[in-house]
From Swiss-Prot:
Residues 163-173 have a biased composition (Basic residues). This is Ribonuclease MRP protein subunit POP4. GO terms for biological process: rRNA processing. The gene is POP4. Component of the MRP ribonuclease complex, which cleaves pre-rRNA sequences. Required for rRNA maturation, including 5.8S rRNA processing. Seems not involved in tRNA maturation. It comes from Arabidopsis thaliana (Mouse-ear cress).
Length: 296
């Protein structure tokens, strides 16, 4: 008896659960149908509204030609046709202007460059590359800026002053002024020059004083001085002595007693000159590129 009641209760519970599931499924189905009906109603209402609007547009009366009011351009009350001022009217493009289609125009040049440049033309057509036009007007009376004009003027003045006082080394070599012919490379020919140099130096020392002898020698003209090469980076020139007859920015030209012309570099060289009772040692590095090497 007890087992029958248990089975009966389980069957009743199962039926109740199935009824609940069925009720939930019916509710979901009803909700979906309602949503679908609302969408259908909304679609039909939109179609009706569009149909009404098109019908109203067709039913509107078209304006007749007689109803359009013509505006007189001479009427002062019309703002759209107010006359322009005289300066503005002159600057407007004239209606009778004809554009030239002849060759050589800017348009033809641009097209020619585009078609000739190959890949660049394709890039230009695609908009990835822009074409820059350099349209310059060359003036007959070109006026330089103040800075460039003043700079060129100063340079020309400087060159003119230098050309008056001295010649460049390049011009000296080209003109042959630095070349001493072999028939003039005689020690005896330059002995009078040595005597003139001694008198010149003695007068110079009297004017400047013995205390400033070193400064005097640095600025003095040494052409005609009897010079002895005590040290030189070229071993064959060490011990050379004679009269100095030519000076450049980097060398001393010496005529020896055996009538030979030697060009001794100043750099890393030591020279000794005899002046009256003094023996003066000169370092060649101090005499490189002197401002007053030779006054010509």
């Amino acid at each position: 008896m007890g087992t029958e009641t248990v089975v009966h209760d389980q069957a009743r519970w199962a039926m109740a659960a199935m009824e609940r599931r069925l009720a939930v499924a019916k509710a979901q189905l009803l909700q979906q149908q309602q949503q679908k009906n609302e969408k259908d109603k909304k679609g039909t209402s939109d179609v009706d509204v569009s149909m009404k609007e098109s019908h109203q547009a067709d039913s509107l009366p078209t304006p007749s030609k007689t109803s359009i009011k013509k505006v007189d351009p001479k009427d002062d009350d019309s703002v759209a046709y107010t006359k322009l001022s005289h300066p503005v009217d002159e600057n407007l493009l004239a209606t009778n202007v004809k554009f030239s289609s002849a060759k050589g125009t800017i348009v033809d040049k641009v097209l020619h460059n585009l078609l000739r440049s190959g890949d660049s033309a394709q890039k230009y057509l695609q908009g990835t590359k822009s074409v820059k036009l350099d349209n310059y007007i060359l003036l007959d009376n070109f006026v330089q800026s103040r800075s460039s004009a003043s700079g060129s003027k100063k340079a020309s003045q400087k060159d003119s002053k230098r050309s008056k006082s001295r010649m460049s080394m390049k011009r000296l070599k080209k003109s042959g002024a630095l070349h001493i012919p072999k028939d003039l490379q005689k020690f005896d020919l330059f002995k009078p020059m040595h005597g003139m140099w001694e008198s010149y130096m003695m007068k110079l020392i009297k004017v400047t004083g013995k205390i400033q002898l070193s400064l005097t020698l640095l600025s003095a003209d040494l052409h005609g001085a009897f010079m002895f090469v005590a040290e030189c980076k070229i071993a064959s020139f060490t011990g050379v002595q004679g009269i100095m007859v030519r000076e450049t920015s980097e060398t001393f030209g010496i005529i020896t007693r055996d009538d030979k012309f030697r060009v001794v570099p100043k750099k890393l060289s030591v020279f000794i000159i005899q002046l009256d009772c003094w023996k003066i040692t000169l370092h060649g590095d101090k005499f490189i590129s002197r401002d007053n090497i030779v006054q010509r």
